[in-house]
UniProtKB/Swiss-Prot annotation:
Interacts with FtsZ via their C-terminal domains. This is Cell division protein ZipA. Keywords: Cell cycle, Cell division, Cell inner membrane, Cell membrane, Membrane, Transmembrane, Transmembrane helix. Belongs to the ZipA family. Residues 41-185 are annotated as: Disordered. InterPro entries: Cell_div_ZipA, ZipA_FtsZ-bd_C, ZipA_FtsZ-bd_C_sf. It comes from the Bacteria. The keyword Membrane applies. It is a single-pass type I membrane protein. It is found in: Cell inner membrane. The chain crosses the membrane at residues 6-26. The lineage of its organism: Bacteria, Pseudomonadati, Pseudomonadota, Gammaproteobacteria, Enterobacterales. Gene3D superfamilies: ZipA, C-terminal FtsZ-binding domain (3.30.1400.10). Residues 27-327 are cytoplasmic. It comes from Shigella flexneri.
């Protein structure tokens, strides 16, 4: 058992020594190859940076414009950066799934001229002197911003179209107001006939003998045209003021009225007449009322309707109108 343990210890020590030697040899080899391939690693790191910038620009929706970072640090700084593991590889895993559009680009090789390496101050001035490449960045962005104002400008177009038919309404011209036609004064009547009726009640007739007595008592005298007239004087002298006729055609009377009957009589006065027409009208109204009371009839107007105060005022207005027209 002790021999087996000793053998295992020796084998383990040999394995450990072999691992140490292999690790040391591997590290030496990698370090020598790192210094040997330093320019290639620098180019690779720049290409990785370019591909990273392109992926970022693609994610942001930017077109062909790219911003390349040019490393003009001194040789010592580059060697120091080469000795360290490249930091660009730390940003590649998030974009490892993205497929680069141009894995190998020749323009970056031309953009890294060797003569810029001895300039130590340019790495500080180069970021400040980049407004020129930044200007193209706004050009691809402008197409994205341009579509936004388009609906804004297109919106007023229907408003203008809706406002165009309203232009004639915006400035309506006042329609000429038709001047009212001058009201022509109604020509005054220069003559008129005032008519009253004394009629029996409905379904009856006036008795001739009673009618004759009432007519004579009212001052009427039988005369021209076989009708009765009321003169200025009760004895029949002077001009006639108004007359009385039969309501039945031809309107005449027979002096022998014992067997005479009629539905009524008509009293009429022509204006203008002799004397005062209004006084003659009052006398005419009194005569009609007297006859109606004597024969048991009623006084009617020219339309054979019941006489009313309004109708009497209308008769008086007609008389005044005729008097004014003949004044």
């Amino acid at each position: 058992m002790q021999d087996l343990r000793l053998i295992l210890i020796i084998v383990g020590a040999i394995a450990i020594i072999a691992l140490l030697v292999h690790g040391f040899w591997t590290s030496r080899k990698e370090r020598s190859s790192m210094f040997r391939d330093r320019p290639l690693k620098r180019m690779k790191s720049k290409r990785d940076d370019d591909s990273y910038d392109e992926d970022v620009e693609d994610d942001e929706g930017v077109g062909e414009v790219r911003v390349h970072r040019v490393n003009h640090a001194p040789a010592n700084a580059q060697e120091h950066e080469a000795a360290r593991p490249s930091p660009q590889h730390q940003y590649l895993p998030p974009y490892a799934s993205a497929q680069p559009r141009q894995p190998v680009q020749q323009p970056p090789e031309a953009q890294v001229p060797p003569q810029h390496a001895p300039r130590p101050a340019q790495p500080v001035q180069q970021p400040a002197y980049q407004p020129q490449p930044e200007q193209p960045l706004q050009q691809p962005v402008s197409p994205q911003v341009a579509p936004a104002p388009q609906p804004v400008h297109s919106a007023p177009q229907p408003a203008q179209q809706a406002f165009q038919p309203a232009e004639p309404v915006a400035a309506p011209q006042p329609e000429p107001v038709a001047e009212p036609a001058p009201v022509m004064d109604k020509p005054k009547r220069k003559e008129a006939v005032i008519i009253m009726n004394v009629a029996a009640h409905h379904g009856s007739e006036l008795n001739g003998e009673l009618l004759l007595n009432s007519i004579q008592q009212a001052g009427f005298i039988f005369g021209d045209m076989n009708i009765y007239h009321r003169h200025l004087s009760p004895d029949g002298s002077g001009p006639a003021l108004f007359s009385l006729a039969n309501m039945v055609k031809p309107g005449t009377f027979d002096p022998e009225m014992k067997d005479f009957t009629t539905p009524g009589v008509t009293i009429f006065m022509q204006v203008p007449s002799y004397g005062d027409e209004l006084q003659n009208f009052k006398l005419m109204l009194q005569s009609a009322q007297h006859i109606a009371d004597e024969v048991g009839g009623v006084v009617l107007d020219d339309q054979r309707r019941m006489m009313t105060p309004q109708k009497l005022r209308e008769y008086q207005d007609i008389i005044r109108e005729v008097k004014d027209a003949n004044a």
